[in-house]
Amino acid sequence: MDLVGPRYIKGDGRFYSMNVIDLYSHRVFVESSRTKEDDNIAQGLLRCWKSMGRPDFLQIDNELSFRGSNRYPRSLGLVLRLCLYFGVHPVFIPVGEPWRDGVVEHFNDTYDKKFFRRQWFSSYVMLKRQSKNFQQFHNKHHRYSCLSRSRLKNDNLLHIGQVQPEGHFYNQRIVNLQSLFASS
């Protein structure tokens, strides 16, 4: 999850975009808001989880809206408390290293180049409507290199059924991939 902004709509003020991307399916959820207050982020996360399902982990940067308060640095903010309440483990990337969250940063670039810079928005309401249209289009049509057809051929998937040594870090990913292919 990442927060993009502030961005500006000519004659209608600023907005922020909360972008969430599922690392396995590359489905996205885009939520625009006027402010980056933690209650807006928390409400957006609830809508995201209702739409996409609740994840096991949520990788986030150290944005103040995500982590809590500078005034009370040892207290948990609303977004963190929401994650913990629903059993979602927040994973923070190191400060000043956005490349550690490369998948969502790549989507932010796609959002900027293929959506925000290619259209003119007369109002914030129009932007919210069009961002949901972009979200639906992206989830249906946009493909990343990891989902290329050559990687989905059966001969490349033979390793999924192989037994890995105990404690091998691919075990969890293989289980997730098996459930992904079993459902399709």
Model regions and ranges:
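RNase H-like DDE/DDD metal-dependent nuclease/strand-transfer catalytic core used by mobile genetic elements
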Residues: 3-17, 23-126, 132, 136-137
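C-terminal domain-tail junction helix/linker
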Residues: 112-184
